[in-house]
């Protein structure tokens, strides 16, 4: 398995073990900044699909003997190399043991991407809309998490590194927050929290208040909503569901079609389809907003 993975084995007469030297010569793309995690400051480097190159990016940032790499192979057919990275003095031994135990349970034939092993790392039996396993393509972000005692899992063939454990509030954090004044970083983070709760609760509040407690709304707003509802054939609930479905369809189309066309699809979906639906009287303008 080591030879098939590109290692050279160094044997010495009289010893019952050999040294495995990483001399892989596989072709891989150059290091570049990940498009999904842009930053104003900091490094412009991102992980690539070569595991050994990714490990070197981590080692260059954490020059400590406390940093440990544990290599293993998963996948009966693919024999994919996977590496656990952690600081021995800071990592939780209990969590580390659970992660290793869960990885040993994986019985897949092929592992082509780090997403294959995420279901095995999440808490079993606890239903949550938010994953307890984080993901990043930035070496500096990953090294910051490792320095906090987290466990990083890198999979050969993908630039997406996994972080265990990962908490809900970390979805609102960004490495740029640590490069600015604490006042601005705090304001930006609270702005993210507010935007999250508005985007998740506002549609339901709009439908609930407009349908069951319209007296709460000011008179001018209530009159505009009543005028919009009177010109559409659907209820507010059905309008909201339709708009959410259209948004998900346009988002999926923008992700899957070629990149030059993705921006055009977003513009067409937001402007043309929305304006046409309102003009035709299928949905109301307040609901679309």
Regions found by a protein language model. Name each.
Residues 1-239:
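Cytosolic regulatory modules rich in charged/polar residues
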Residues 196-199, 205-208, 213-289:
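Generic detector of multi-pass transmembrane helix bundles and their immediately adjacent loops
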